[in-house]
């Protein structure tokens, strides 16, 4: 809508017509997203959080809980709602009222809780891979990667991380750091875990050149090639001439130097 090559008056006319179409339950003129679900009751959330395992507290009195899904829970519904808000804010999101998937039912959820405003600040989804595979539960990352049997020692002592978010009103307030405090507390309770792994999403709003640089950098310094552990089901393909151009700037000789170069290149995009 915003990019239509027409004047403001014409845009207003089309937008008014779009709203009339919606009101009459007819096909809208513009593609729209599903409305995000209404917030859960704060009283019900507080009651449900009190039944979760408490594993930590931050200096500013945020509480860290571990939630295991059971039945129809306001916690899981609110996590799904806030995920959708956070991901839509960066041009992503499922397009649904809540962002939930089948894995949520048997993964654990690390939650940062604001006791004053009675709100979920953010969350991380955790998968204790040894326990999950013993129970024959599929890992989320198995939908993205092909693992070989040589990954077994890592699964036996591993924790899959993913689906992290912080709701926008708490951005810039150390919320992600606090979630990592919670991960540290979880690891302290499970000393067998030695390996953390999981997928990272690059937003489609990021310029392609920036994504190319990030993929090139991490393939250069942390490639899984030759390890015979894992391969991507949908590998990212760099432009044919990208290596020839990038290797003059990011050499692969010194990680710290290459990382500073990467940051400078990204800052100028």
Q: What residue ranges belong to the model's regions?
A:
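Conserved beta-strand in the GNAT
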Residues: 111, 119-127
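Short catalytic/ligand-binding loop motif for oxyanion handling, primarily in non-cytosolic enzymes
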Residues: 2, 120, 204-208
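Short amphipathic alpha-helix that is part of the acyltransferase structural core
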Residues: 56-109
């Amino acid at each position: 809508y915003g990019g239509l090559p027409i004047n403001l008056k014409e845009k207003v006319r089309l937008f008014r017509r779009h709203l009339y179409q919606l009101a009459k339950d007819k096909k809208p003129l513009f593609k729209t997203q599903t409305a995000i679900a209404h917030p859960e009751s704060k009283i019900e959330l507080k009651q449900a959080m009190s039944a979760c395992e408490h594993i930590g507290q931050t200096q500013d009195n945020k509480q860290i809980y571990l939630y295991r899904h059971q039945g129809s829970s306001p916690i899981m519904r609110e996590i799904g709602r806030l995920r959708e808000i956070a991901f839509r804010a960066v041009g992503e999101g499922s397009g649904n009222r809540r962002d939930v998937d089948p894995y949520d039912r048997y993964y654990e959820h690390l939650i940062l809780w604001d006791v004053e405003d009675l709100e979920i600040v953010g969350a991380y989804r955790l998968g204790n891979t040894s326990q999950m595979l013993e129970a024959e539960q599929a890992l989320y990352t198995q939908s993205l990667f092909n693992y070989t049997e040589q990954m077994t020692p890592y699964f036996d002592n591993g924790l899959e991380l993913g689906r992290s978010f912080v709701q926008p009103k708490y951005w810039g307030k150390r919320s992600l750091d606090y979630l990592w405090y919670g991960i540290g507390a979880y690891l302290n309770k499970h000393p067998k875990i030695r390996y953390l792994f999981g997928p990272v999403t690059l937003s489609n709003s990021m310029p392609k050149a920036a994504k190319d640089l990030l993929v090139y950098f991490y393939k250069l310094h942390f490639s899984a090639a030759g390890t015979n552990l894992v391969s991507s089901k949908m590998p990212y393909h760099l432009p044919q001439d990208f290596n020839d151009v990038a290797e003059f700037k990011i050499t692969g000789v010194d990680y710290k130097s290459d990382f500073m170069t990467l940051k400078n290149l990204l800052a100028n995009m």
